[in-house]
Amino acid sequence: FILFGIFILTEKKVAQPLLDLGIFKSKLFSMSIIMALFNFTVAMFSSILLPFYLQDFRNYGPGLAGMIMMAYPVAMLIASPLAGSAADKMDKEIVTFVGISGIVLSQLGYLLINPHSAPWLVVVILLIQGMSMGIFQSPNNALIMETVDRKYLGIAGSVNSLARNMAFVLGTSLATLILFTAMSNPVSYTH
């Protein structure tokens, strides 16, 4: 955090900054970046935690666990081009909002999972999450690129990629922290 603060202060003072912070003046750009960060962080949680739930808690074999997990990318594969096409014809903000709403719904769906849940429930939740991520991603990327001047397209794309990669790191770190804290509690390794 300290280095990030120093970076921001330096970028504000230099004549030719590495990252022109002026692009963040657009509320739509900033919100789209924050939403990308949020959504990819959330995506990493299920990618990290669900295999442990399916294999270690539910005692499913790797094959069945993998087949269940396939619901997410298959749904995303189907939804992404359809959402991109829809976003070209209607308001991208609405399509993005639908995607975000579906992601929130899928996360609430995980609250329904218990030790006796049928595998189809996990598949349905993953389908909703995958479709929602597919619906969200294309129009959100377009919003990010449309909200900046043409001369900042490279920077906007880089910030978008940075947000995605930071989300992968953040989501993986938080998910593994939660996982290993939960796994350590029964054997008294935390305290």
Annotate each predicted stretch with a short phrase.
Residues T190-H191:
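Conserved small/polar residues in nucleotide/adenosyl-binding loops
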Residues Q16-N185:
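12-transmembrane solute porter fold
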Residues I2-K12:
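C-terminal membrane-cytosol helix-exit motif in multi-pass small-molecule transporters
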